Regions:
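Non-heme Fe(II)/2-oxoglutarate
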Residues: 48, 170-172, 177-195, 201-206, ...
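A structural signal for short, well-ordered beta-strand segments and their strand-loop junctions
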Residues: 25-28, 95-98, 155, 169-172, ...
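A structural signal for short, well-ordered beta-strand segments
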Residues: 98-100, 156-158, 229-233
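Non-heme Fe(II)-dependent double-stranded beta-helix
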Residues: 1-21, 27-136
Length: 250
């Protein structure tokens, strides 16, 4: 399966791949200069002692509060060439509702089991039908959202490093977003159906939150980082009252 594509005048292929596979790879959204600039912006932002920073033995491997410490990160969705495609998928008036940052520092790699992204960040917990499992992460209330909402959302993973087998790529099950009522399929997933996402710095992996995915360990001895900006997008006026997004940057 070829999930790599880029088009500036027509997004027919991207729409087809998103519908069929739940994902596609958008090549070269950022050039080398832009990648370097965003790495610098991230490094400066992460000098803060914000509660959303995730560290292990002094190495930062993530941030749950990217919109708080680096507000202009929303420009990656708003001002670059991918904006037109997002408008076509989500409709005008959409917003960035959560921003995360992930790294796999050399000698501090990590892995995640197979899962789907089902939680959303809200302003406050509320008793609304089908919104469950209230939690608080980095001081931000979260809920598990119903399938109907997650099906309308979109995730951008902007890669600031080249990713290959050496530095712990994402692995996905193409098409799994279409059978996401529960996660029973993850225990019996065929290895032949699993696709590792290898990409260049500046590429963007576009996916539906309900696409099943895992994250592999980096290889021992690697000197490579795997720095990724993760932005979650949602249409306007989609949350039922009284729920509100913790952030909605349009």
């Amino acid at each position: 399966m070829n999930i790599s594509s880029k088009a500036k005048t027509s997004y027919a292929k991207e729409h087809q791949e998103l519908e069929l596979h739940g994902c596609f790879l958008y090549r070269n959204l950022l050039d080398d200069v832009a990648v370097t600039n965003w790495l610098r912006h991230c490094s400066a932002a992460f000098e803060t002692e914000d509660s959303g920073m995730l560290r292990s033995r002094g190495s930062l491997y993530g941030s749950r509060s990217l919109l708080r410490v680096l507000p202009n990160v929303v420009e990656l969705a708003q001002r670059y060439a991918l904006r037109r495609f997002i408008d076509e998928v989500l409709g005008t008036g959409w917003g960035v509702v959560r921003g995360l940052f992930f790294d796999k520092p050399p000698e501090r790699s990590w892995t995640l089991p197979w899962h789907r992204d089902r939680t959303i960040a809200v302003e406050a917990h509320a008793n609304v039908e089908h919104f469950t499992n209230p939690t608080v992460k980095a001081g931000i209330p979260h809920l598990v959202a119903p399938q109907w909402l997650l099906e309308r959302m979109l995730t951008l993973r902007i890669h600031l490093d080249e990713v290959n087998a050496e530095n712990g790529p994402l692995v996905v099950l193409p098409g799994s977003h279409r059978c996401a009522v529960c996660d029973d399929d993850l225990a019996t997933a065929s290895e032949a159906a699993m696709v590792p996402i290898h990409c260049q710095a500046g590429d963007v992996f576009v996916m539906r939150p309900l696409l099943a995915h895992t994250s592999l360990l980096s290889m021992p001895g690697t000197s490579r980082h795997r720095r990724t900006i993760h932005l979650e997008l949602a249409p306007a006026n989609v949350l039922p009252a009284p729920l509100q997004w913790h952030d909605f940057v349009d």
